[in-house]
Amino acid sequence: QNTKSYEIGADLTFFNGLVTLNYTYSRQNVKDQIFEVPLAGSTGASSMIMNGGKIHTNTHEVTLGISPVDTKNFKLDFAFNFSKIDNYVDELAPGVESIMLGGFVTPQVRAGIGDKFPVIYGKSYMRNNEGKIVVDQNGLPMQGEDAVIGTVSPDFRLGFNTNIELYKFRISAVFDWKQGGQ
């Protein structure tokens, strides 16, 4: 497989180091991605490993740092971080629309053209014309068609950390939030 990547960023400092702001954007293009591609049963084999696709990744990361106190015996700082990483399947082997990456029954993890990478594929809920889930006479959701029902990767991540240092004693706290992804 061949990879081309590009990255651009900025590091800004304000108020003599009291506030820092960092931003990074990167794009990675992978072609001839190595996949296990399914074969027709008539070939006598179930699949073949080959260079069979293109994937691109867009990444955004922002970090805001604040250091309100920085003296000889006492330091206090905070940092906030946001990151978003999106992978997309642009192309697979000729004639292949999606590739199963894991799972023998539904749901499965798959790579499909035009989808985020990877996705969870399985039975969806039946929906009416308004997009609402259809239920049976017992109030249970009715099964729909096979479809993308989730993503493996999160939509974004948020982070917060703080450090307090008094003389040579330091205490730190970290908080992480992941939105999306099953």
Model-derived regions: residue spans:
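Transmembrane beta-strands of outer-membrane beta-barrel proteins
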Residues: 19-21, 76-78, 160, 166, ...
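Transmembrane beta-strands of outer-membrane beta-barrel pores
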Residues: 25-31, 66-68, 82-88, 166-168, ...
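Membrane-embedded beta-barrel scaffold of Gram-negative outer-membrane proteins
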Residues: 1-44, 83
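Outer-membrane beta-barrel proteins
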Residues: 30-36, 47, 73-75, 87-93, ...
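Flexible, solvent-exposed coil segments and beta strand-coil junctions
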Residues: 1, 37-47, 59, 133-144
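Conserved small-residue
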Residues: 50, 69-152
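Active-site beta-strand/loop architecture of penicillin-binding DD-peptidases
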Residues: 26-32, 39-50, 144, 150-156
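Outer-membrane beta-barrel signature, preferentially recognizing the C-terminal barrel domain
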Residues: 1-20, 47-71, 116, 151-157
